[in-house]
Structure formats: structure tokens, C-alpha cells
Amino acid sequence: MLALGGIRFSVDGQSTPIPETLGYRGMMLSGLPNMAVALGYTNASWTLKCDLTSEHVCRLLSYMDRHNFTHCIAINHHKDMKTSPLLDFSSGYISRSIDEFPKQGDRAPWRLRQNYLFDTLSFRFSRLKDSALAFYSATSRDTALHK
């Protein structure tokens, strides 16, 4: 199994290996601006979590639009945080490739919950702006440089 289909990411010409990223709320990857993934529950219907993630990303995009932000990036400020595999699943096809996937941290918002009720309340009613997210607005010059 290939993490995110084997896509190789880079930001401003610098490679960002997926195994070095942390999952912010299980949907954004640290260090990758404007990037979200939908990973479902391993203990319940996969689509329940994917639906919550999609709703939350739409809330985030609306927030960015209202405040004229063009970039949102998840930043891990706790470099000494203990990590573990993002997917807590013991199937052979996952176990063989788990080192290629993002990690999760040992505290919020980097800890992946496998709890639909908790996630529903958190994703639908939490504040969008927190200390782990940075928002930026690109200037015309910035945008031209990245074309």
C-alpha cells in the first residue's frame, strides 16, 4: 500500500517526505500548506470520519475566504512530542507499509481519535483558528513567484 498514492510532496522546492509529517486532527499534514486528506475510522464506518473531515475542510475554506487568507498550514510546535503510526490497524497490508505513512502525536490536535461522538462535537463546533494552524495571505508578487 502506498501512502497517499505515492505522491512526492515539496514546498518551495524542498522535499517534504510523508513519513516526517504529523496528522493535524487526522486530516492535514504538518508542513504542507492547503493540504487535507480524508482518513476514516478503523473501528467504525470509514465514511463517518471522511464526512466529518469534509465538513471541517469546508468550514476551514470558508473561514479562509472570509478573512482573505490564501494559505493554511499545520505547524507542530512540539518537536520533542512522542509519535506513533497514524493508522492504528494491524492488518498485514497496513503493517508492511506503515513506515511510509504520516505519524500522529501524543496530544491534541496531533492525536487521532477513533471516537465519532468526540470528533462530531470537535469538528463541527471547535474554533477554526488555533496555535497549530498558521494562516497567510499571498500578495500578487508572492503568487507570481509560485506560478
Summary of predicted features, one role per range:
Residues 1-46:
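Glycine-rich loop(s) and the adjacent beta-strand/alpha-helix scaffold that form part
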Residues 23, 34-147:
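C-terminal, flexible cofactor-proximal segment of oxidoreductases
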